[in-house]
């Protein structure tokens, strides 16, 4: 205890962080990890597991021949933005019909309606404008929209098995974590034959930690993830993100709609533009944050886990769920600025998305994930009663089963001729 206090006093005097993440000198493969230099001096550790038994090409070709025309979904919706910030989403196709969207897991329900009217939803609440219901329908139709976006495309969503050589799973962690939080998922899916990729964000795990705040902005981190994605991506890629990592999955799905086949968002929150809070404990000086680090770790344990027993403390420690220097933590929180990632940005996504929410999560309220389910086009929301923010550590078997069922899910083929006739 005295040693810990002394270390913090020395830190306040010298500004040097004990046990901080140091630079990685190699950019080669080591102990099953890749160290990739995405920019000069910016090296990320990546866990890349290749299947021990590559998929049978003949079996894949036979599967493709049998199911080549299946899983075709017509994604059609009109997104209207009004000048008072209100948003109206009309699903014009039959994409969200329950007979088309179904999973092997009977508990999964498709989220969405044929017409949704939504007010501006920001991190500060709904104060931006009046409610849509307060305006008479006749007057509402006469309003001149600020912007109208038409989404009209076809996607082929297929079953993704571990034996398929064109499938890669990407796992992206959030603030304070590392790729170690995915240990159970990486082991489970690699044993099923999937190729898996999990990076450490810069400043986290064994990646380098630049001592400049600009290195931790959303845009800098997003470009890192773009480099990782372009390095390992194949024909069908599935992105799995947790917390802040969900934002990077959303970014990649928007940037590469033809390469991102499915997305899983675990406790990612609502479809809101990112903006750092002005009144936050993370705006305090780094030395003060360092002195408060034991309190922050305890607060994370309380808010991130449904229980706070010995097992959870061990998971927190061994999973590196919250193990980052005070400088990196402060820079990460203040760098979360992404105005483009608003409701419209999310509404434009046509990729199938699974939302996973831990019922006891104190960081992300349930209504935020429900809001996300309303905005997205093809989505399922699954609530895990026993889990919290770190649900992949608390309930690994449940999460693994849920993810696997979603990977295997394939929608029934739509009758596009009948649908187009109905729309006319």
From Swiss-Prot:
A matching Pfam family: Abhydrolase_1
InterPro entries xrefs: AB_hydrolase_1 (IPR000073), AB_hydrolase_fold (IPR029058), Epox_hydrolase-like (IPR000639)
CC annotations in GO: mitochondrion
Protein's name according to its UniProt entry: Protein ABHD8
S-S pairs: none
E.C. code: 3.-.-.-
Biological process, per Gene Ontology: lipid homeostasis; phosphatidic acid biosynthetic process
Record keywords, A-Z: Hydrolase
Taxon lineage: Eukaryota, Metazoa, Chordata, Craniata, Vertebrata
Gene3D superfamilies cross-referenced by the UniProt entry: alpha/beta hydrolase (3.40.50.1820)
Region entry Disordered, spans: 120-143
PANTHER family: PROTEIN ABHD8, RE40534P-RELATED
Keyword match Nucleus: no
Protein family (similarity comment): Belongs to the AB hydrolase superfamily.
Domain AB hydrolase-1 residues, every copy: 168-270
Annotated active site: 243 (charge relay system), 361 (charge relay system), 389 (charge relay system)
An example molecular function term from Gene Ontology annotations: lysophosphatidic acid acyltransferase activity
């Amino acid at each position: 205890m005295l040693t810990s206090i002394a270390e913090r006093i020395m830190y306040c005097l010298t500004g040097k962080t004990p046990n901080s993440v140091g630079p990685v000198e190699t950019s080669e493969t080591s102990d099953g990890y890749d160290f990739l230099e995405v920019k000069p001096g910016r090296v990320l550790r990546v866990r890349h597991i290749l299947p021990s038994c590559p998929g049978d090409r003949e079996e894949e070709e036979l599967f493709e021949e049998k199911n080549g025309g299946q899983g075709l979904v017509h994604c059609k919706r009109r997104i209207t933005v009004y000048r008072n910030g209100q948003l109206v989403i009309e699903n014009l196709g039959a994409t969200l019909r329950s007979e088309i969207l179904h999973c092997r897991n009977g508990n999964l329900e498709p989220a969405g309606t044929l017409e949704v009217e939504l007010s501006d939803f920001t991190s500060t609440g709904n104060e931006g404008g009046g409610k849509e219901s307060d305006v008479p329908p006749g007057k509402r139709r006469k309003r001149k929209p600020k912007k109208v976006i038409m989404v009209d495309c076809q996607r082929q969503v297929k079953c993704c098995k571990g034996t398929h050589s064109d499938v890669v799973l990407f796992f992206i962690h959030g603030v304070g974590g590392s790729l170690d939080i995915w240990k159970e998922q990486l082991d489970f899916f690699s044993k099923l034959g999937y190729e898996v990729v999990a990076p450490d964000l810069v400043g986290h795990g064994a990646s380098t930690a630049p001592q400049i705040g600009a290195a931790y902005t959303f845009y800098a981190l997003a470009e890192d993830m773009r480099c990782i994605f372009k390095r390992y991506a194949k024909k069908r890629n599935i992105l799995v993100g947790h917390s802040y990592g969900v934002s990077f999955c959303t970014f990649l799905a928007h940037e590469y709609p033809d390469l991102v086949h499915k997305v899983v968002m675990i406790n990612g929150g609502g479809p809101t533009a990112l903006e750092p809070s002005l009144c936050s404990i993370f705006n305090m000086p780094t030395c003060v944050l360092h002195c408060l680090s034991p309190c922050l770790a305890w607060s994370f344990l309380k808010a991130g886990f449904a229980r706070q027993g010995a097992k959870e403390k061990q998971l927190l420690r061994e999973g590196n769920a919250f193990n980052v220097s005070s400088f990196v933590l402060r820079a990460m929180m203040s760098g979360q600025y992404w105005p483009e990632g608003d409701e419209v940005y999310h509404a434009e996504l046509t990729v199938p998305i699974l939302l996973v929410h831990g019922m006891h999560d104190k960081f992300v309220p349930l209504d935020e994930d429900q809001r996300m389910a309303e905005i997205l086009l093809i989505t399922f929301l699954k609530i895990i009663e026993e889990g919290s923010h770190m649900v992949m550590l608390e309930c690994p078997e449940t999460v693994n089963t849920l993810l696997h069922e979603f990977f295997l899910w394939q929608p029934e083929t739509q009758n596009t001729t009948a649908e187009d006739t109905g729309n006319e």
